Swiss-Prot record:
The protein's name in its UniProt record: Envelope glycoprotein H
Species assigned in the record: Epstein-Barr virus (strain GD1) (HHV-4)
Summary of subunit composition and partner proteins: Interacts with glycoprotein L (gL); this interaction is necessary for the correct processing and cell surface expression of gH. The heterodimer gH/gL seems to interact with gB trimers during fusion. The heterodimer gH/gL interacts with host EPHA2 to facilitate virus internalization and fusion. Interacts with glycoprotein 42/BZLF2.
Renumbered residue ranges of the record's region Interaction with gL: 165-229
Virion surface topological intervals: 19-682
């Protein structure tokens, strides 16, 4: 429905001065016209603060033709509208029959019984919360005042600045349209402004005369348009460093669903962050395009909600879409220091937190993958209203433990598992970044399992994803692991050697991976581990393995005040390798734990499958030249049996060693399988010698009697 309101001001002249007596209102709704006359005094009572003088100035009906023509000539006109036939997706799914309808403004305990209960949220109250703020959508400043009437309304916005306030971007949005405005102040103090407007053509704001949208529209398809508003001078200035592919920008904004579009933008930002684009952002096409796309991601969610009118929005869709926006909000805050106002519903957050309170977090890993992801998304969305943080970590850890137990050893994560763990990781990330986690075992277990999943093949898969720009580079357990040994040379040796991969792209992928593992990141800190206080030289730590009752700190020097000290002294490592168990989180009283102990060898490693005698232990492998390879945490008999029945131990490579780390702080090297093989080979050789000797003796006896 399009509503056109035309105010006719009737001026009565009294003593040479103009005064407003009444307002004549003409309403034209889809061809049906109505006329009303409202006394000004009555209108002022209903709308206090409404100034007739301001209305008169804004209408500018006395503007002469020359001024109007000059204003028209200043504004940039497109060379032509790019018409594209695009398929517009059905974003919000139909609400299932029997769904509980929830009013976002009236969420109370017990409104939904649990995760299995279908539910939806009424669109109108939800939209009102998303666009709660009142602000100036269309400012009374040039060039906007040349083209639009000033507009204040309920809105949301994304705002950021680069180089102080020299460059600013604001993506202001209603549920109808988005206006992304770039503003740059030059060294001379000149200000250049350019705006991109996206939305349904029929819902775009009214224009001043003599403008029309066809001359301003860059791209159009079906219901949607992309409009440029700037002056010719400002356009020429921006064109020096901002030449966006408007066709691609517009096509993605129209054809992608809200959640998939937000994920696309998130992936761009992750890659940008890894390349250092956050620390030193370039004012180029890629950066400026990404800024606009960030605001489009937020707009598409609010727009989809608004398009349902007086309907109801499926809660699963809301959980998925607002999870993506939450993650996106986190990274633009970290990357650009961006501010997001609005696009947040306290009703949705409260409902999500209440639903999570009905779930036994420690049993979350036993649910289906679909329910795990739904619950973890709700946990992220409802985090501000959750209250109890440790329970959420327990849920993410339960899901990770379940995935770890059924994951093949040393294999990269498959797509579905990577997505599930990516969703769960943001519960952990939020607590680490907000510095609210206490010394809980759940977080230690989460990081231990992440460390165990960070194998050479997993690293290779992530590097491939980063080099090709695919989603496999978006998340890896390595990002939340306690591995600190991954250098550039080591990562290059793990990178896939494929003809399709450009070596420059691989090199950039390695740099990005290293950037993601930077110790300056909050999520790479191990401050929450009690044994952390026993470490004096953090730059010498290679890996931390927190087991039950003992934490092993592997380092390249002896400066760890642990309960004991082991050294891999029989190797040819270019740098030393020390293992310091910290038992019951108690540091040694002295500077170090004394002289290194000899690591004993197990010559007969038993292949038992009847009981889990190694549960709670960890296996650590290292190469005499390359250093640490990987660690495996034995969580169950299935994991133990998988280790014993597979080719886990590569004893053909005599330069690789396997250490067993126990829960009492003891370290042992496993060499039994190699010794078994040697005994078998020796037995075969002795049998062959005996057989040959027997044949020789028989030959001599036969020859003697002949």
């Amino acid at each position: 429905m399009q509503l056109l309101c035309v105010f006719c001001l009737v001026l009565l002249w009294e003593v040479g001065a103009a005064s407003l007596s009444e307002v004549k209102l003409h309403l034209d709704i889809e061809g049906h016209a109505s006329h009303y006359t409202i006394p000004w005094t009555e209108l002022m009572a209903k709308v206090p603060g409404l100034s007739p003088e301001a209305l008169w100035r804004e209408a500018n009906v006395t503007e002469d033709l020359a001024s109007m023509l000059n204003r028209y000539k200043l504004i940039y006109k497109t060379s032509g509208t790019l018409g594209i036939a695009l398929a517009e997706p059905v974003d919000i799914p139909a609400v299932s029959e029997g769904s509980m309808q929830v009013d976002a403004s009236k969420v109370h305990p017990g409104v939904i019984s649990g995760l299995n209960s279908p539910a939806c949220m009424l669109s109108a109250p939800l939209e009102k919360q998303l666009f709660y703020y009142i602000g100036t959508m269309l400012p009374n400043t040039r060039p906007h005042s040349y083209v639009f009437y000033q507009l204040r309304c309920h809105l949301s916005y994304v705002a950021l600045s680069i180089n102080g306030d020299k460059f600013q971007y604001t993506g202001a949005m209603t549920s109808k349209f988005l206006m992304g405005t770039y503003k740059r102040v030059t060294e001379k103090g000149d200000e250049h402004v350019l705006s991109l407007i996206f939305g349904k053509t029929k819902d775009l704001p009214d224009l001043r005369g003599p403008f029309s949208y066809p001359s301003l529209t860059s791209a159009q398809s079906g219901d949607y348009s992309l409009v440029i508003v700037t002056t010719f001078v400002h356009y020429a200035n921006f064109h020096n460093y901002f030449v966006p592919n408007l066709k691609d920008m517009f096509s993605r904004a129209v054809t992608m669903t809200a959640a998939s579009y937000a994920r696309y933008v998130l992936q761009k930002l992750v890659l940008l962050e890894m390349k250092g684009g956050c620390r030193e952002p370039e004012l180029d096409t890629e950066t400026l395009t990404t800024m606009f796309e960030v605001s489009v991601a937020f707009f598409k969610v609010g727009h989809a909600v608004g398009e349902t009118g007086n309907g109801c929005v499926d809660l699963r869709w809301l959980a998925k879409s607002f999870f993506e926006l939450t993650v996106l909000k986190d990274i633009i805050g970290i990357c650009y220091g961006a501010t997001v106002k609005g696009m947040q519903s306290y009703g949705l957050e409260r409902l999500a937190a209440m639903l999570m309170a009905t779930v036994k977090m420690e049993e979350l890993g036993h649910l289906t993958t679909e329910k795990q992801e739904y619950a973890l998304r709700l946990a992220t969305v409802g985090y501000p209203k959750a209250g109890v943080y440790s329970g959420l970590i327990g849920g993410a850890t339960s899901v990770l433990l379940s995935a770890y137990n059924r994951h093949p050893l040393f294999q990269p994560l498959h797509t579905v598992m990577r997505e599930t763990l990516f969703i769960g990781s943001h519960v952990v990330l939020r607590e680490l970044r907000l510095n609210v986690t206490t010394q809980g075992p759940n977080l230690a277990l989460y990081q231990l399992l992440s460390t165990a999943l960070c194998s050479a093949l997993e690293i290779g898969e992530v590097l491939r994803g980063l080099a090709l720009g695919t989603e496999s580079g978006l998340f890896s357990p390595c990002y939340l692991s306690l591995r600190f040994d991954l250098t550039r040379d080591k990562l290059l040796s793990m990178a896939p050697q494929e003809a399709m991969l450009d070596q420059a792209a691989v090199s950039n992928a390695v740099d990005g991976f290293l950037g993601r593992l930077s110790l300056e990141r909050e999520d790479r800190d191990a401050w929450h581990l009690p044994a952390y206080k026993c470490v004096d030289r953090l730059d010498k730590v290679l890996m931390i393995i927190p087991l039950i009752n003992v934490t092993f700190i592997i380092s390249s020097d002896r400066e760890v005040r642990g309960s004991a000290l082991y050294e891999a002294s029989t190797t040819y490592l270019s740098s030393s390798l020390f293992l310091s168990p910290v038992i019951m989180n108690k540091c040694s009283q002295g500077a170090v734990a004394g002289e290194p102990r000899q690591i004993p060898k197990i010559q007969n490693f038993t292949r038992t499958q009847k009981s889990c005698i190694f549960c709670g232990f960890a296996l650590l492998s290292y190469d005499e030249k390359e250093g640490l390879e990987t660690t495996t945490y034995i969580t169950s008999q299935e994991v133990q049996n998988s280790i014993l029945s597979s080719n886990y131990f590569d004893f053909d490579n005599l330069h690789v060693h396997y250490l067993l780390l126990t829960t009492n702080g003891t370290v042992m090297e496993i060499a039994g399988l190699y010794e078994e093989r040697a005994h078998v080979v020796l037995a075969i050789i002795l049998y062959f010698i005996a057989f040959a000797l027997g044949i020789f003796l028989v030959h001599k006896i036969v020859m003697f009697f002949l």
